[in-house]
Design a protein with these regions (language model features):
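An N-terminal boundary/leader segment
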Residues: 1-48, 278-280
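Acyltransferase
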Residues: 13-20, 51, 261-287, 314, ...
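Flexible, acidic active-site loops/lids enriched in D/E/S/T/G that coordinate Mg2+ and/or position polar
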Residues: 43-66, 72, 91-95, 105, ...
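Conserved small-residue hinge/capping positions at short loops/turns
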Residues: 61-84, 111-114, 118, 276, ...
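Short helix-loop capping/hinge segments that flank enzyme active sites or metal/cofactor-binding pockets
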Residues: 65-85, 246-254, 304-343
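DPxDG-like acidic metal-binding loop motif
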Residues: 79-92, 158
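Short glycine/serine-rich loop segments
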Residues: 97-224
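A short helix-breaking turn/cap at a secondary-structure junction
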Residues: 186-267, 325-334
Length: 343
């Protein structure tokens, strides 16, 4: 738990050098094969950040994430830290500003350790379409970590960081969380600001937290959530933490989803449902009846918005430039052909 780390730092049982060094030793030992990061901050910079956090912890004036190392998906803008979207098109891009979620993390004392690998422009589900090479699952290097936030999921599973941020359009947080045996949340649309997210499908994409336990997930979510005047899609309602008792809680179970799930998945879900039922929850089967249209609708929206959003990367205004000269249509085609991958 992040509270335990903060307590150990405050009381001196954990010093900044050994604390940060333990993460970087794991990264040094395994990163060459896992490839969770695109950009990793120098260890000495991170140690200095932690030293400042320890001072604030001991003064009693500290944030909720004080001193905690966080991995950030590489489509979330971080001032002064390269942000590539896993693409040659943005290979050298260093944002001059922070995304709102990064501002909030920094304000609460969180420390960015690096930017994680991802499917190019978040279009993929295996983290294999990155210009920087594929990420592997730390539990089994022959397997995928899921995607498109596979680098964030892998970084958590390998204990390269304590918390992580991902983005989710059609499963890009939830899939890596499941594949890497960690936790991930796609927040309800509008609860987390998307300002500074390099999105490919604005109507669907959300930034969300990832962690190794529910307590830490809740803390990170509470930090990044909330209205933002720079994102008109955020909701103005104040988010409140509520205690929910399982006894008497009414839960819907999507029957049509269970019908198409594989046996191992059904087994795990049924185990959870039985546990909830034994705790006094009321389970009600729900059949939506229109799930056959969900995936086609998703692809129509996502691909339409992707074609619009990615049109700006032409090598003239934004993105990789081949340096070729000629008719503008030819130059656009050459730049985009060289800057984008096959996905």
């Amino acid at each position: 738990l992040i509270q335990e780390i903060q307590r150990n730092l405050t009381e001196g049982r954990l010093d900044p050098e050994s604390y940060v060094g333990a993460y970087y030793e794991r990264i040094k030992r395994r990163e060459a094969k896992v490839r969770a990061f695109i950009t990793l901050r120098p260890m000495d910079e991170v140690i200095e950040d932690v030293k400042r956090s320890v001072e604030r912890l001991r003064s009693g004036r500290h944030g909720r994430l004080e001193g905690i190392l966080i991995a950030v998906k590489d489509n979330i803008s971080t001032m002064g830290i390269r942000t590539t979207c896993g693409s040659k098109m943005l290979e050298t891009y260093v944002p001059p500003f922070d995304a709102t979620v990064i501002e909030r993390i920094r304000r609460e004392g969180g420390i960015i350790v690096g930017k994680t690998n991802m499917d190019e422009f978040a279009m993929g589900s295996t983290t294999e379409t990155s210009y920087f090479g594929p990420t592997r699952n730390p539990w089994d290097l022959s397997r995928t970590p899921g995607g498109s936030s596979g680098g964030s999921g892998a970084a958590l599973a390998a204990h390269f960081a304590e918390l992580a941020l991902g983005s989710d359009t059609g499963g890009s947080i939830r899939s890596p969380a499941a594949y890497n045996a960690v936790l991930g949340l796609k927040p309800s649309y509008g609860t987390v600001s998307r300002y500074g997210l390099i999105a490919y499908a604005n109507s669907l994409e959300q930034i969300g937290p990832m962690a190794r336990n529910a307590n830490d997930l809740e803390v990170l979510y509470s930090v990044i959530a909330g209205p933002d005047e720079r994102d008109a899609t955020t909701v103005s309602a104040v988010l409140e933490k509520k205690e929910v008792r399982l006894n008497g809680l009414r839960l819907g179970v999507l029957d049509d989803m269970m019908e198409v799930s594989e046996k191992p998945v059904k087994s795990v879900v049924n185990d959870v449902l039985n546990k909830l039922s034994s705790e006094g929850s009321e389970l009600k089967e729900v059949k939506l009846g229109y799930l056959d249209y969900a995936l086609p609708a998703y692809y129509i929206i996502a691909m339409s918005e992707a074609s619009s959003n990615l049109a700006r990367y032409d090598g003239v205004r934004y993105g990789y430039s081949s340096g070729e000269e000629g008719l503008w249509t030819d130059v656009y085609s050459i730049n985009r052909g060289a800057g984008f991958g096959w996905e």
